[in-house]
């Protein structure tokens, strides 16, 4: 287990944590009913890919047609802010400590690693959603799917 994200509350740091969390979280169908991350990550990736071109198109269209620039700029800024909102949410989620029910499940999965003879680094601090994402990613690679039965 790598880390607990620093408690830095900076906006840029939250966005960076969001990117890291987005790369770490396993996109698995079995997790979708319990965690909103799958939907948020898909929407954020879509926004990162398509919103900047949409913003440029909006500005270009308004300038070409001689329309007002103010609403076009507002629309472009809104379109560009959507993926940033997703990254911020993911960053905030990554640094949130796990609630008691997920904390219990987190330790049960770690115990299954121990039963399988796979060494895990000790947990040093209160586990966060980032810690859970790292553990789940490893579990989907190295364990059978029975660890999902306890959810």
UniProtKB/Swiss-Prot annotation:
Signal peptide: none annotated. Keywords: Cell inner membrane, Cell membrane, Membrane, Transmembrane, Transmembrane helix. It is found in: Cell inner membrane. It comes from the Bacteria. The chain crosses the membrane at residues 46-65, 69-91. It is a multi-pass membrane protein. Pfam families: DUF412. Its main location: membrane. InterPro entries: UPF0208 (IPR007334). GO terms for cellular component: plasma membrane. Coiled coil: none annotated. HAMAP family: UPF0208. Belongs to the UPF0208 family. This is UPF0208 membrane protein YfbV. It comes from Photorhabdus temperata. The lineage of its organism: Bacteria, Pseudomonadati, Pseudomonadota, Gammaproteobacteria, Enterobacterales. The gene is yfbV.
